């Protein structure tokens, strides 16, 4: 196997925008070499610092590239999606995904192969389909936005522990922090109603899972124009926690602690900033409106993906 990724004969029909942390992985270099040997004109661009994914998405569009592949974890995908969404729709390249790193919730929900070569083949060869993209304020997300307890766990998990334990890190930090958690009081508005709730957890799903495989929006489809809205109210006793867990198993439309709705948009107002994660990327908002842009992005998703409506 070659020590370096050999350059294409020309600049490529597709760009792989690769997270710099993954650029030296032997399995990635081997996969790139194999798809090139199979005849794909794939050029590689590597990110070095924050904002590079946005810049490279723009440069790909300016170069007339029809498809870009986000090589990295959920954060890399989120940054490149944000870059693509800043472009005019008629010049916006399609997106493929090469899942790498410790957090690949969107790729996992899509059912993408974990082996780099097979994932690259899907990203390169699958006809792209139009899918929805979420907006929250001025930010974008393609998978899931979570707020409250879930976001607090993810933000406070040390990066080395996250890499070491994978999804288990989230459960560990959850057990350590649950009994000191303070709920977030806020008002939620959506087309058919509003709620004043002490929030334990809030999830807005375009995709289905977050936090290392936790299914927060199991009915989600990325092409139906609807957000999955999961509201989990604060609990104060073991008995209430047991009921909450039972309701999470069944996802009632209107339970004592859990509500699961499908809405085109939702608004949140609070006197205090709510910790949020958009595709795993942390932020804080006191007030926001979240919605979907239906069919805004073309995505190379595997045939038969559970996140597609198959219409």
From Swiss-Prot:
Keywords: ATP-binding, Cytoplasm, Kinase, Lipid biosynthesis, Lipid metabolism, Magnesium, Metal-binding, Nucleotide-binding, Phospholipid biosynthesis, Phospholipid metabolism, Transferase. Belongs to the diacylglycerol/lipid kinase family. YegS lipid kinase subfamily. It comes from Chromohalobacter salexigens (strain ATCC BAA-138 / DSM 3043 / CIP 106854 / NCIMB 13768 / 1H11). Pfam families: DAGK_cat (PF00781), YegS_C (PF19279). Its cofactor is Mg(2+); Ca(2+). Its main location: cytoplasm. One of its GO terms (molecular function) is magnesium ion binding. The keyword Transmembrane helix does not apply. InterPro entries: ATP-NAD_kinase_N, Diacylglycerol/lipid_kinase, Diacylglycerol_kinase_cat_dom, Lip_kinase_YegS, Lipid_Phosphate_FormReg, NAD/diacylglycerol_kinase_sf, YegS/DAGK_C. It is found in: Cytoplasm. Mg(2+) binds at residues 221, 224, 226. Residues 9-140 form the DAGKc domain. SUPFAM superfamilies: NAD kinase/diacylglycerol kinase-like (SSF111331). GO terms for cellular component: cytoplasm; plasma membrane. Probably phosphorylates lipids; the in vivo substrate is unknown. Its EC number is 2.7.1.-. Binds 1 Mg(2+) ion per subunit. Ca(2+) may be able to substitute. ATP binds at residues 47, 73-79, 102. This is Probable lipid kinase YegS-like.
């Amino acid at each position: 196997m070659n020590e370096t990724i050999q350059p294409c004969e020309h600049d490529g029909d597709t760009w792989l925008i690769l997270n710099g942390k993954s650029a030296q992985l032997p399995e990635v270099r081997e996969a790139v070499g194999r798809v090139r040997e199979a005849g794909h004109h794939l050029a590689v661009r590597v990110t070095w610092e924050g904002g590079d994914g946005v810049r490279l998405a723009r440069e790909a569009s300016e170069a007339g590239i029809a498809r870009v592949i986000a090589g990295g974890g959920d954060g890399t995908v989120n940054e490149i999606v944000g870059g693509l969404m800043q472009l005019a729709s008629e010049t916006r390249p399609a997106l493929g995904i090469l899942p790498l790193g410790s957090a690949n919730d969107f790729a996992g929900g899509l059912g993408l192969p974990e082996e780099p070569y097979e994932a690259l083949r899907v990203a390169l060869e699958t006809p792209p389909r139009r899918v929805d993209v979420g907006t929250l304020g001025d930010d974008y997300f393609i998978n899931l936005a979570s707020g409250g307890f879930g976001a607090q766990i993810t933000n406070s998990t040390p990066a080395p522990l996250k890499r070491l334990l994978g999804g288990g890190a989230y459960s560990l930090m959850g057990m350590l922090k649950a009994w000191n958690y303070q709920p977030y009081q806020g008002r939620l508005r959506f087309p058919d109603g509003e709620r004043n709730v002490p929030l334990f957890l809030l999830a807005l799903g375009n995709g289905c899972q977050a936090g290392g495989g936790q299914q927060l929006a199991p009915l989600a489809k990325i092409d139906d124009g609807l957000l999955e809205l999961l509201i989990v109210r604060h609990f104060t006793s073991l008995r209430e926690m047991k009921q909450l867990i039972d309701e999470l198993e069944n996802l009632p439309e209107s339970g004592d602690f859990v509500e699961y709705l499908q809405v085109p948009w939702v608004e949140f107002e609070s006197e205090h900033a709510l910790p949020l994660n958009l595709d795993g990327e942390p932020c804080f908002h006191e007030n926001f409106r979240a919605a979907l842009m239906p069919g805004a992005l073309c995505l190379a998703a595997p045939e038969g993906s559970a996140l597609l409506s198959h219409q």
